[in-house]
Amino acid sequence: PLNTSCQLDSLALRRTRLRSGLAKVIGFDSGTANLLIYIKGEGIVLNEPSVVAIDTDNKKVVAVGHEASEMLGRTPGKVKAIKPMKDGVIADFEITEIMLDYFIRKIHARNFLSRPRILICCPSNITPVEKNAIKEAAERTGARRVFLEEEPKVAAIGAGMDISKPSANMVIDIGGGTTDIAILSLNDIVTSDSVRIAGNVFDQDIIKYIREKYKLLIGEQTAEEIKIEFANIFNPDKKHKLEVRGRDLVTGLPSTIEITEEETEEALRESITKIIKAVTAVLEQTPPELSADIVEKGIILTGGGSMLNGLVPLLKEKLKVPVFIADSPLTCVVEGTGVLL
């Protein structure tokens, strides 16, 4: 018969195996604009804005996600809606931890028997300190283990690319905070770059343009609506107009103006030019054989920013290679985590 020590060891082993079997395996796309979660065996279970509303008087959380996002620019003085992620990395550690913990509890991914294993995507070319901050924030929510993977690699996998072969695949992932550009072959990144220009900067470009040209102040949500529903950066129509409402900076009163498609192209031109320069620099660093693959296969765009009207034909014209948008650009990264889990 087993002695007491052996019996205890055996029981501990069974408990460990049970907990491991019960533990959920989770993929996070913790973006600047939105946070998406994929659970192995279940698929995408959460897609919410990366926003937390805090009562500044007592430091209590008022809302997280969709509810908090609706408060942006509309909160009373004591309530502040915060975006804790900036440029794809943590800008406010404490609020990020609160947000991750809230979402993990919302999807019931943690219980007294088990702690989840988490795969989190992060932009390429971020600093070791920034990587450690992302990992630590996830660990402090009760994760058993946390793994990091570079976003362009995961986006490519989520877009359906086979990156395992000795052939080049190129992806441009334009999210809320960063644009990640990478050429991949044999399951690794051959050359890459990451610029902190993406959807949120596009919004700020539109706000700045309208403020400077028309002395009209508009909010982030209005700017985002203009970007998504009206802006055009390739052969824009100067006759196509949109009414925009905001606050007149001279009188302080509500006011309405009209802007044209051509003006949106002008507002976004500098940021788009910087992205194209970064893409060109990556292509210039690519070995000739892999360059030939890209000419044949083209470039795949992922992320919400890839849906900017006119971006595909503009990139085709500037880069002289085929350019395509992934089938599900908004969810490529989190779907890629699902393949890797």
Where do the PLM segments sit?
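Nucleotide/phosphate-binding catalytic cleft detector across ATP-hydrolyzing
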Residues: P1-I174, A182-I300, S306-L341
